């Protein structure tokens, strides 16, 4: 099986905190989402003309090595189309806080449940099970947003997050539609052969015995992808196998005809063929994986809006 992992859109640290001025017709604010006790950075976009209305909502997050700041053009387009659009950075990515681990055993006594400790950050590593947890917590956060319409929630995902949104829809019936573009949907490449299997399970054993820590932040071990995988966390991650756990969700899959990072037949094509609910498949001709962000970007954006309009608009 060919390695399936995805695009790491390059961005520097300063770009994530650079001032952002939204268009005049768009309401914009930054927000914080708490995921398993850690603060995640979010951005909220809405049409100013609909300030007093509940809106169909599109929740968005980045793929492997990206940040929420890169999603602003799409979020603005969705807001202009009448949606509440919310983007967020996973824990340990972009402007979100890092997860932390103790570097020494917890003290035996700590009044009021508090103690001072030295910790180490877990940052810019890729763990699909952690990331779907962040999606679930972002959905929980949305429930109290004044403009959020709880009956009309859609998810947008691209590349690695194109698989994450499928997984989330399979496990949360509040998701009514997804748009998944150039999505990778099966983590079992980590155990695809005996060499990969041994590497994955040896890493897990060493981590469990304290002989190996998390990868360093942002390290590149797979091509130019920023962020090393926590290999064992990919083994149970196979949303392509369970698409029919989301009968309530309309699923659109957009793929690149000349996809070079993985075999579409093992990912979106397989998911589309298996899914028995409302679905659509679009093959964009003559583009590679990265073309979805370049020459086919506007086409993909238009396809997403049309799909969400069909299944989320009143």
Q: What is each stretch, according to the model?
A:
Residues 78-99, 104-115:
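Conserved alpha/beta-hydrolase
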Residues 64-76, 90, 266:
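The serine-hydrolase catalytic nucleophile loop
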Residues 285-290, 294-314:
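Catalytic active-site module of serine/aspartate enzymes centered on a nucleophile-bearing elbow/loop
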Residues 17-53:
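N-terminal cap/lid segment of alpha/beta-hydrolase-fold proteins
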Residues 106-146:
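Alpha/beta-hydrolase active-site loop
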């Amino acid at each position: 099986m060919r390695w399936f992992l995805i695009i790491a859109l390059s961005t520097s640290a300063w770009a994530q905190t650079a001032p952002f001025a939204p268009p005049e017709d768009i309401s914009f604010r930054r927000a914080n989402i708490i995921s398993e006790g850690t603060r995640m950075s979010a951005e909220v976009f809405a049409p100013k003309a609909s300030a007093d209305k509940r809106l169909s909502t599109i929740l968005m997050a980045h793929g492997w090595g990206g940040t929420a700041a890169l999603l602003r053009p799409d979020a603005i387009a969705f807001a202009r189309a009448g949606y509440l659009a919310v983007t967020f950075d996973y824990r340990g990515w972009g402007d979100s806080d890092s997860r932390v681990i103790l570097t020494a055993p917890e003290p035996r006594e700590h009044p009021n449940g508090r103690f001072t400790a030295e910790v180490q950050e877990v940052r810019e590593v890729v763990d699909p099970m952690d990331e779907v947890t962040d999606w679930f917590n972002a959905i929980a956060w949305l429930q109290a947003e004044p403009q959020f319409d709880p009956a009309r929630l859609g998810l947008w995902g691209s590349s690695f997050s194109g698989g994450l949104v499928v997984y989330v829809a399979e496990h949360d019936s509040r998701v009514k539609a997804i748009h998944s573009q150039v999505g990778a949907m099966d983590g079992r490449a980590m155990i695809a052969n005996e060499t990969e299997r041994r590497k994955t399970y040896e890493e897990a054993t060493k981590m469990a015995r304290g002989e190996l820590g998390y990868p360093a932040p942002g390290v590149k071990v797979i091509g130019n992808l920023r962020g090393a995988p926590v290999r064992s966390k990919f083994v149970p991650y196979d949303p392509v196998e369970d698409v029919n756990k989301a009968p309530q969700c309309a699923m659109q899959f957009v793929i690149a005809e000349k996809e070079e990072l993985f075999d579409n037949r093992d990912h979106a094509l397989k998911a589309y063929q298996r899914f028995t609910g409302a679905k659509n498949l679009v093959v964009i001709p003559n583009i590679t994986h990265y073309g979805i962000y370049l020459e086919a970007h506007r086409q993909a954006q238009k396809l997403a809006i049309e799909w969400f309009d069909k299944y989320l608009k009143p």
